[in-house]
Every structure is written in structure tokens, then in C-alpha cells.
Regions:
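C-terminal long alpha-helix characteristic of the crotonase
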Residues: 27, 144-149, 200-246, 253-254, ...
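Conserved CoA-thioester-binding segment of acyl-CoA-metabolizing enzymes
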Residues: 1-62, 280
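CoA-thioester-processing core
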Residues: 109-116, 124, 130-183, 197, ...
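Glycine- (often His-adjacent) and acidic-residue-rich active-site loop
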Residues: 61-113
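Structural motif
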Residues: 101, 124-125
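Acidic, divalent-metal-coordinating active-site segment for phosphoryl/phosphodiester hydrolysis
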Residues: 186-193
Length: 280
């Protein structure tokens, strides 16, 4: 199905039997998020909101991973702090787009749009769900993962915070101490551990197959009742979202391009321990 303004080498959409099958389609890059992917996901989510006949959405990634996070080339831009020019002509992200809110708004949108869609969204996770990838998955209503999936709130390694709605979605799923530990350390957890702590709903050897089966079960129920149930569950989260997302933007604005943030990225590429400066 053709989505206006969306390149099919980033996201594909098919609709069958009430199930909207959305797939990140950049397998050669582990479905990493570049500017085209950001815009494609946002446009796809908005398109589905008004697409007739949709009862359930299944979100997955082609190839070896669900989503490995922000495109690797973009971190080279972060190492120098970037500028306030938005997206570069070559398609790489400019850190200025982050610091001045443009990308941050869009980055939040590609995760939260799945909550704005009035029908259930199921994410099928395999391979990697790192950084922006895990925050994208957290925007779904239900997550089914392979036991060996590698998940991480990875932003701390780049000297930043999870600013793609993750502070809200993590806090609603996990105990505060567990959520904080994952953010403070950026450690990688398996699908098994993610299931044990409540980050993942179910484990499956074939997450996409199980997600489709669950979607078919949901699609067989009264669609009005299903939509009503999602609305009721999401009412409180929606009232909290605006303030929390504004706070995320405020913090990322302060961090991006700062000396310590640039040092975190530079040290990663130099394969050395970072040397940070403590504020007095």
C-alpha cells in the first residue's frame, strides 16, 4: 500500500483482514533511524489513524533486527556538536535539529503516534531494539520478543537521555528503580530479562508469527469495544504526555552539543574511556 510521502525503502504497509502490517524496511542497516525513516514512520502512523478497516496494527522490522536505534552516521555529526540547520542535504541528521526541537518533536512523534492510533498496536521484536528502537517498541500497546533479542536504553553511551517518549513509557511499565537503572547504565538486556521485568509482554521463537496470531484474535472482536478499551486505558497517559515530553525536549536541548556530550561520542569512536568535566 502506497503511503503519501513515504519511501518504501524505509517503511512498508499492507492491510489484510483488518490487520495493518507495518514493517521497517532498511534491513541492510538493521532498520536504523535516519531522517527518511523518521519521516516515514511519522507519516505511516498518521496515515493509519484514518485508514478504513484497520482493527489492529503489527509493527516489525525486516532482516536481522527490529531497530538498532539512531543511524550510525548521525553520531559522527553529534561528535562535533552539529549546528542549528535541521537535516543535512545528504540525509544525515544534524545535531542542531535535536537541540532546537525539530527532530526531538519528530522523534517523539514516531514513538507516540502508535498510542494515538485508536486501535491496538503490537510490536514484534527480534535481533536488536536499541536506543530509539526500544523507545519505538515502547510506543506499542503489546510487545512480543524473541528470548535472545538484545534491548537497551542506549542513550547514556552517547551522553544524552531517552528523549523519544521513553521516560514516560518506561515509567509506566517498570518499577522506578528498574527504569532508572536501565537508563543510568544503558546495559543490554535479553528478551528473557525484558519479559521478567515487564518490558515485554510475551516471548516467542517467532515473534512476528505470534504477533499476527494475536492480532487476528483481537480483530475478531467488536472493533468499537476494542477502540473504546484502548481509549480508556490511554486517557491518563495522554494527560501526562505533553508535560513529560516538553521536559524531555528541555533536557536534550541542554545536553546536545555540550562539552560532556561531545566527549561521550568522541570517546566512543576513539575507543577510549571518556574524560568528563564535573560541574561545580
Amino acid at each position: 500500500m502506497k503511503i503519501p510521502g513515504v519511501s518504501e525503502d524505509r517503511v512498508t504497509l499492507t492491510l489484510k483482514d483488518g490487520i495493518a502490517d507495518v514493517r521497517l524496511n532498511r534491513a541492510d542497516k538493521r532498520n536504523a533511524l535516519d531522517s527518511l525513516m523518521f519521516h516515514a514512520l511519522a507519516a505511516t502512523g498518521d496515515f493509519i489513524k484514518t485508514l478504513p478497516g484497520v482493527r489492529v496494527v503489527v509493527l516489525s522490522g525486516e532482516g536481522a533486527s527490529f531497530c538498532a536505534g539512531l543511524d550510525f552516521a548521525s553520531f559522527h555529526v553529534m561528535a562535533s556538536g552539529g549546528s542549528a540547520t535541521g537535516f543535512k542535504k545528504n540525509g544525515q541528521l544534524d545535531a542542531g535539529a535535536l537541540t532546537h526541537g525539530g527532530l526531538t518533536h519528530l522523534a517523539q512523534q514516531i514513538c507516540w503516534v502508535w498510542q494515538e492510533i485508536p486501535v491496538p498496536v503490537i510490536a514484534a521484536l527480534h535481533g536488536h531494539a536499541l536506543g530509539g528502537g526500544i523507545q519505538l517498541a515502547l510506543g506499542s500497546d503489546i510487545r512480543i520478543a524473541h528470548p535472545d533479542t538484545q534491548l537497551s536504553v542506549r542513550e547514556i553511551y552517547w551522553g544524552i537521555v531517552p528523549d523519544m517518549t521513553g521516560t514516560l513509557t518506561l515509567s509506566r511499565l517498570l518499577r522506578p528503580d528498574i527504569a532508572k537503572e536501565l537508563v543510568f547504565t544503558g546495559r543490554i538486556i535479553s528478551g528473557r530479562e525484558a519479559h521478567e521485568i515487564g518490558l515485554v509482554t510475551h516471548l516467542a521463537d517467532d515473534p512476528l508469527n505470534d504477533a499476527m496470531a494475536l492480532a487476528a484474535t483481537i480483530a475478531a472482536h467488536n472493533p468499537d469495544a476494542v477502540r473504546g478499551a484502548k481509549y480508556l486505558f490511554n486517557r491518563q497517559a495522554s494527560t501526562e504526555a505533553a508535560g513529560q515530553f516538553a521536559a524531555e525536549r528541555e533536557v536534550i536541548f541542554a545536553l546536545m552539543g555540550s562539552d560532556n556530550q561531545k566527549e561521550a561520542v568522541a570517546a566512543h569512536f576513539d575507543q577510549r574511556a571518556p574524560v568528563f568535566i564535573d560541574k561545580t
